Amino acid sequence: MAIELDLQLAVEDQNGLPSAQDFQTWLDKTIPPFQPQAEVTIRIVDSQESHQLNHDYRGKDKPTNVLSFPFEAPPGMEMDLLGDLVICRQVVEQEAIDQDKPLMAHWAHMVVHGSLHLLGYDHIEDDEAEEMESLETEIMQGMGFTDPYLAEKE
């Protein structure tokens, strides 16, 4: 089975979005070293839906790039469902411009970053952030992208 993708496009204009194969490739390069089989939903949303979800689940009054919703199976129930990633198209596109990053690289980074959250990684504490960013960089470079944190390190 490997990694199963459920892609939901909840945006009116789907032009310029990564393909289902792009999303699948990014998941395939990120998740299997940690969990060989998994099902992940990626939902691409507009800023209004992202804003609402970010407000409801994180208490933040603005849209955000990616939200991760890990699935926790009830005790005794074995499931490969890892969770959901909700990615906001407008935020990702604006961040790519603001950070002077190639758009597809930033999309890939959001999938990698969100997937690591689904796998239990976090960046609240400095040591956790360092570990997570290091993994993100390693995965991104393994796919031929540059270090997504390069500008912050300079």
Swiss-Prot record:
One of its GO terms (molecular function) is RNA endonuclease activity. This is Endoribonuclease YbeY. SUPFAM superfamilies: Metalloproteases ('zincins'), catalytic domain. NCBIfam families: rRNA maturation RNase YbeY. Zn(2+) binds at residues 113, 117, 123. It is an enzyme of class 3 (hydrolase). GO terms for biological process: rRNA processing. Single strand-specific metallo-endoribonuclease involved in late-stage 70S ribosome quality control and in maturation of the 3' terminus of the 16S rRNA. The gene is ybeY.
